[in-house]
């Protein structure tokens, strides 16, 4: 059984993934950071229930947004602070879907310092610039 980890009032609760809900994992590629973004180049959406992946190019972003609007749960990496705000800024996208942001999950489970320590201890061959949190600074 797959589980969904949710933080409510700083406490974690495990709940089963519901077969009755539509879970969409998505990512987008754009032309810049939030302050300077002017265009979304593409959006890829994976429907967990149907196990189908959909790719939307620059001429089909409206279709991708309509697809995202069908979700009960949206999942992605840094979607709270980047992807969803970019879609709102450029296309007036809003959602009432539950959000699972894997960047937030990662930081809750492994604080930056702990990630660095784990990388150093378990993977000493990993170059220092690739250790630690998944941030621009890391890369």
Task: Briefly describe each language-model feature range.
Residues 31:
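Conserved Rossmann-like nucleotide-cofactor binding loop
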Residues 4, 13-16, 21-26, 34-35, ...:
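Conserved DEDDh/DEDDy metal-dependent 3′-5′ exonuclease domain
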């Amino acid at each position: 059984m797959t589980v969904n980890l949710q933080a409510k009032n700083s406490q974690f609760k495990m709940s089963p993934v519901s077969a009755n809900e539509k879970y969409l994992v998505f990512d987008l590629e754009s032309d810049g950071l939030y302050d300077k973004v002017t265009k979304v180049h593409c959006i890829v959406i994976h429907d967990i229930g149907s196990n189908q992946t959909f790719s939307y190019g620059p001429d089909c972003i409206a279709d991708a947004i309509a697809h995202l609007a069908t979700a009960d749960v949206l999942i992605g990496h840094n979607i709270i602070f980047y992807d969803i705000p970019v879609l709102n800024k450029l296309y007036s996208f809003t959602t009432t879907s539950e959000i699972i942001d894997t960047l937030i999950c990662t930081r809750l489970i492994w604080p930056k310092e702990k990630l660095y320590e784990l990388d150093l201890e378990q993977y000493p061959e990993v170059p220092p610039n690739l250790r630690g949190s998944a941030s621009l600074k890391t890369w």
